[in-house]
Structure formats: C-alpha cells, structure tokens
C-alpha cells in the first residue's frame, strides 16, 4: 500500500547547511513524490568564505547586498539540482548568532504554511553557533506553531518527527559531548550525483565544477556514513522523538549487495 505524500521541511543555519547534511535525503523525498521545503533563517554572509578571504587580503569593503543576493541564488540553484523548488530565505543577519523572537515567529509561519510531517535540522548542541541557534529557534517555533497564534490563520500543527544531522559541526572538544551515532541512515547512493551538483553550486564556499572539494567531502562524509550499513553513500540522522509501534519493526528497505559498499561513484562524476 502506497503511503501518502509527506511534507518535509529542512532548516539550515546558513544557506549551504541543509544541502551538505541532507541534500541526498531531500532528493530522495522529491523522487518519492513528497513535498520538500528548505528554509534558511539568515543571509549567511558570515560564511561567504570567498568574500571574507578577499576582504582580508585587500581590505576593500565589498557590496554586502550583492553578496547576500549571491548566497541566496546559490541556495535556490542548489535546491533546484535536488528537485526542490520551495526555498524560503528569511535573510536575517548571522554575524552574532542569538535567539531572536521575530525569527522564531517567521519559522513558525513557515511551519503553519507547509505543515511538515518531518523537520530536518542541526543537532541541538552543534558547536557552530549559527547551527545550534537555528535549531533552538526551530524547536521554539514548533512549540509556537502547535498552538493558537493571534492574528495567524494557520491551523495548530506539530510535526510527527524531527531528525537532527548526525555529523559534527566542527572538530573540537565540544563535539565530544554530542552523540553522532545515527538512529536512521538514509541510502543516498541513487541521488549522490544530484547532491554533488547541488554542492557545486556553492562557489562562495570553495565548491564548483573546477574544485575537488565536493568529491573529497562526498567520499569522506557520505561515504563514511554508509560504511556500516554496507552501502556506498548515506546520510545519518538522530530522531528527536521515540517512534511508537505495536511490534518491533525490521526495516530492510535500502539494503544493497555488500560488494558495492566500496563503490566510489564520485570518481566518475563529471561536473557540468
């Protein structure tokens, strides 16, 4: 029996985040007929590494509005590579990542609009401040969206599940206190080229058809996540809430011939 289409909302603290940590999963859900929306609360200027490097070198103030537009277009283009056309960019400043009530309200508005069954976002204690703050605001927005909000026509809504990225934000001692063992592993082997194309749209952060960065990270991060599942590429997630069953489930979906575990498909990927 076919399941009903789901509404999936991915939230990243910066424009690249949802793509690098869940882009393959997003593409899989689109292919399954689900509605996928990606949301970025900030303009992401603090992570425009190309502009930051140039400014450090020449000390000439760039056109900040042009840089913000560039970052926004990259996210739109990257999402399109995955088949995602519903891209929400709230455009708030990310220089000092703090919880902002207005952003919480706006995230709650998006929740009320798309009524997600699933939200995918960063781990709550991710050591990148913009990641952790985005998740804190997301959880607060979920609380707000679950009740009656004066002046809002959205029905109260609570997603069935939240999945946190099971990858480290940075390599530092803070991350040692966070579980990175996934409760769910999504086989993204069939969508790994789509994810590579999406990541190569992020030229402001060193990606692109002429850069080896995506091939390196794709094999290192997504390849590593698939090892114990005996699949070439995967994305890992940690469920926020326990799932309820009448009997214990055994999920066999996605099992592959273990001989393909070491396939390195990105060696053959030809960027456009």
Where is each model-derived feature located?
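Metal-dependent de-N-acetylase/amidase catalytic core
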Residues: 1-11, 85-86, 97-272
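Active-site rim/loop-helix segments in enzyme catalytic domains that contact anionic ligands
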Residues: 1-114, 144, 250, 257
């Amino acid at each position: 029996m076919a399941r009903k289409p789901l509404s999936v909302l991915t939230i990243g603290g910066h424009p690249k985040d949802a793509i690098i940590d869940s882009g393959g999963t997003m593409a899989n859900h689109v292919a399954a007929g689900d509605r996928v929306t990606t949301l970025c609360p900030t303009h992401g200027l603090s992570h425009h590494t190309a502009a930051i490097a140039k400014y450090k070198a020449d000390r000439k103030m760039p056109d900040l509005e042009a840089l913000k537009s560039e970052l926004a277009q990259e996210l739109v283009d990257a999402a399109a590579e995955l088949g995602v056309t519903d891209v929400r960019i709230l455009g708030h400043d990310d220089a000092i990542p703090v919880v902002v009530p207005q952003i919480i309200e706006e995230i709650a508005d998006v929740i009320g609009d798309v009524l997600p069954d699933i939200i995918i976002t960063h781990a709550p204690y991710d050591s990148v401040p913009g990641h952790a703050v985005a998740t804190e605001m997301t959880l607060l927005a979920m609380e707000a969206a679950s009740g009656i909000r004066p002046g809002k026509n959205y029905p109260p809504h609570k997603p069935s599940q939240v999945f946190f990225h099971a990858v480290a934000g940075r390599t530092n001692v803070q991350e040692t206190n966070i579980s990175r063992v996934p409760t769910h592993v999504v086989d993204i082997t069939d969508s790994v080229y789509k994810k590579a194309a999406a990541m190569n749209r992020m030229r402001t952060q060193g990606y692109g058809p002429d850069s080896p960065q995506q091939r390196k990270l794709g094999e290192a991060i997504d390849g590593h996540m698939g090892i114990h599942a005996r699949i070439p590429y995967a994305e890992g997630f940690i469920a926020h809430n326990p799932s309820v069953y009448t009997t214990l489930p055994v999920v066999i979906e996605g099992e592959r011939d273990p001989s393909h575990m070491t396939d390195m498909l990105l060696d053959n990927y030809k960027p456009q």
